């Protein structure tokens, strides 16, 4: 049974008027992926779904990615095939429109798994990815407002740990996007993000860490969202797939993974989406919101919500 699920990030959507736009964004993305999935390829479906999310400036990935402490964009992305365990990822990449597509090329064109920074950019240029500026006016304005808050309180001189910063300034935690699909033969997972607002230059979250924020094997795939350091420490995407290997379905495994995150790091930290090799979808969160949408064989329209 073919199935695909996408997410637009876990956290709190502070402006209620944004919720319909977010739901429409994940709905459009899952439909883009579903069209590819019906042609038979989970890999193409995941890439297309994530590209649709990257191209929508309401989400924190690709166009509309958040800015680092020094006002730049450093994006992360990863994709993984469950049947072969092939994987590709980029971290701290800039100047490209769709990091997920560069990550796929790392998987298909090299013997490596992860390329970072300038090396990832050079690789993208060699393969014909054009120069692109993903910074939007809205993100630049948000960055300036946050910087002003921090400067007024003197926070920039004595930089806080990320979890302390998020507690005091929750607006720095922005969404990640991801997709997981099953085409009847293989599960594929992909994730993309601009990271955390005002992150230290060079900071890498869970998204490009295979097993941390992105993972797929022969039984299941997962894409995580939230505070990346939590997912890395728990190897959360891999842990979720392991729960399926132990006999859980995708929904039960998703809930177990989030329970694990809450146990060790508290609420308001993580969200996850999954698909297992039986075509079951799963999603769970310990945050107020996590936008999602999914389609399966037998459904006429996607289910979407926050």
UniProtKB/Swiss-Prot annotation:
First-level EC class: hydrolase
Reactions mediated catalytically: L-asparagine + H2O = L-aspartate + NH4(+)
Domain of life: Archaea
Biotechnological and industrial applications of this entry: L-asparaginases are widely used in fried and baked food industries to prevent formation of acrylamide, a neurotoxin formed by the reaction of asparagine with reducing sugars. TK2246 reduces the acrylamide formation more than 80% in French fries, chapati and yeast-leavened bread. High activity and effective acrylamide reduction potential, without compromising the sensory properties, make TK2246 a promising candidate for food processing.
Description of how activity is regulated: Undergoes auto-cleavage in a temperature-dependent and glycine-independent manner. Metal ions and EDTA do not have any significant effect on enzyme activity, indicating that activity is metal-independent.
Thermal dependence of activity, per record: Displays activity at a broad temperature range and is highly thermostable. Optimum temperature is 85 degrees Celsius. Shows a half-life of nearly 18 hours at 85 degrees Celsius.
Extent of the signal sequence: none
The EC number(s) this enzyme carries: 3.5.1.1
Entry-linked SUPFAM superfamilies: N-terminal nucleophile aminohydrolases (Ntn hydrolases) (SSF56235)
Active site: 176 (nucleophile)
Binding partners and assembly: Heterotetramer of two alpha and two beta chains arranged as a dimer of alpha/beta heterodimers. The uncleaved protein forms homodimers.
Similarity remark: Belongs to the Ntn-hydrolase family.
PANTHER family assigned: L-ASPARAGINASE, N(4)-(BETA-N-ACETYLGLUCOSAMINYL)-L-ASPARAGINASE
Protein name as catalogued: Plant-type L-asparaginase
